[in-house]
A protein has these predicted regions:
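GHKL (Bergerat-fold) ATPase N-terminal catalytic module, capturing the glycine-rich phosphate-binding loop
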Residues: 1-180
Length: 183
């Protein structure tokens, strides 16, 4: 018999549901995870700004939480490094793909910069998906520092995701908007 290799196939929505519900028992964990992501994004912008000053911004580092009871969403905004369309797809479109883990590897390869990595939090790439414990739709709008194009990533956590060009009301950073489930 000839040998052949095949990739595993999976029902992504079921795996995502298992990952979310087995890792997290506290529904409020999503807020900590998203705030950690925002903090990591700011740290990445600061770190990369040391060698590329255009990435630094004149504003203070900011993370903002917005609650809109009328439209039933919670939004976490930051002025961190932001993402481009490829990074959105790679990071948010791949379960257990951590942008922080990749960044830590980059720092590890450049041993002189290890101290910059000490305060980065998210390393496993699943914390973001805890948002689907409380939201039926998640919308991420982001603009990578040093670019002038913004993108929006939208998913219901079941059928996949869409990425499109977007308008953004601040020059860099990310907004994660969770449209809260009815239950």
């Amino acid at each position: 018999m000839d040998k052949f290799t095949k990739s595993f196939e999976a029902d992504t929505s079921k795996i995502l549901n298992i990952v979310i519900n087995s890792l997290y028992s506290d529904r409020d964990i999503f807020l900590r995870e998203l705030l950690s992501n925002a903090s990591d994004a700011i740290q990445k912008r600061r770190f990369q700004g040391q060698t590329t000053p255009i990435l630094l911004n004149s504003e203070d580092d900011q993370i903002e939480i917005v609650i809109n009871k009328k439209k039933k969403y919670i939004e976490i905004k930051d002025n961190g490094i932001g993402l481009n369309d490829e990074e959105l797809s790679e990071t948010l479109g791949t379960i257990a793909k951590s942008g922080t883990a990749g960044f830590l590897k980059e720092i590890e390869d450049n041993k002189d910069s290890k101290s910059a990595a000490q305060s980065l939090i998210g390393k496993f790439g699943v914390g973001f998906y805890s948002a689907f414990m409380v939201a039926d739709t998640v919308e991420v709008t982001t603009q990578k520092a040093g670019t002038n194009v913004a993108y929006t990533w939208v998913s219901d956590g079941q059928t996949g995701y869409d990425i499109s060009k977007a308008e953004i009301d601040h020059p860099i950073g990310t907004s994660v908007r969770l449209f809260i489930k009815k239950d």
